[in-house]
């Protein structure tokens, strides 16, 4: 089973990992000013009461007066921001998708736990970030582990140093990396048979292999450009 939440982008995450995201949801709830522009907590509670009464809904189920978009990817419906706020706060979960249209359900009702997971501690979240990167990337740097998450760098750096001291990680010199340090687990550095190149498929420009463009350039010598983020005149 998987759930959706933000990692390097909105991603599918194993449901078994949910406990590592509960602290981030709590932190979102503790910063009301972050969402002041999309509406008040009272408006969010009103929307949550509607979902509790009527069941899961999408933005298409909400009829309201339209407003001017704040930016190109915004919605003309004010409730879209409220849905997103409640999602990042851990009050709603994405229970279904039809392309870009998300259906939201009450968080606890969606997961239907007998017992809600215990939130991970700060140390556990740090270890999760490092272990997840090692599993996905094999060879990691501080930037690749903490992509778009600079506040975690200090704790992750300290954990890396501790694991190097215990010989659970080893420093790796990468040609062309300059001063950027890399690490790997010893097992990853054992010689393996060359992979079948036909088995390598990159399905999305949001794939972590490509979205970290400096890393892609370093390892693949490929300067990736995601043209959806470029003005028309700069596209190829």
How should these model regions be labeled?
Residues 1-236:
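Long, charged, low-complexity, helical-prone intrinsically disordered regions
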């Amino acid at each position: 089973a998987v759930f959706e939440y933000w990692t390097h982008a909105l991603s599918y995450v194993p449901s078994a990992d949910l406990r590592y995201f509960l602290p981030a949801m709590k932190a979102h709830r503790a910063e009301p000013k972050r969402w002041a522009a999309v509406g008040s907590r009272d408006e969010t509670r009103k929307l949550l009461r509607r979902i509790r009464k009527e069941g899961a809904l999408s933005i298409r189920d909400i009829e309201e007066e339209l407003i001017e978009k704040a930016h190109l990817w915004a919605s003309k419906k004010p409730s879209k921001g409220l849905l997103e706020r409640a999602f990042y706060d851990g009050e709603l979960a994405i229970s279904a998708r039809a392309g870009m249209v998300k259906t939201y359900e009450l968080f606890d009702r969606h997961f239907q736990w007998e017992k809600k997971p215990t939130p991970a501690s700060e140390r556990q979240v740090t270890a999760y970030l490092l272990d997840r990167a090692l599993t996905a990337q094999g060879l990691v740097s501080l930037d690749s582990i903490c992509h778009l998450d600079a506040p975690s760098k200090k704790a992750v750096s300290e954990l890396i140093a501790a694991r190097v001291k215990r010989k659970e990680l080893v420093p790796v010199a990468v040609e062309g990396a300059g001063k950027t340090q890399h690490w790997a687990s010893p097992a990853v550095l054992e010689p393996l048979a060359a992979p079948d190149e036909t088995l390598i498929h990159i399905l999305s420009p949001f794939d972590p292999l490509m979205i970290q463009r400096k890393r892609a350039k370093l390892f693949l010598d490929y300067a990736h450009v995601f043209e959806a983020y470029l003005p028309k005149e700069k596209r190829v």
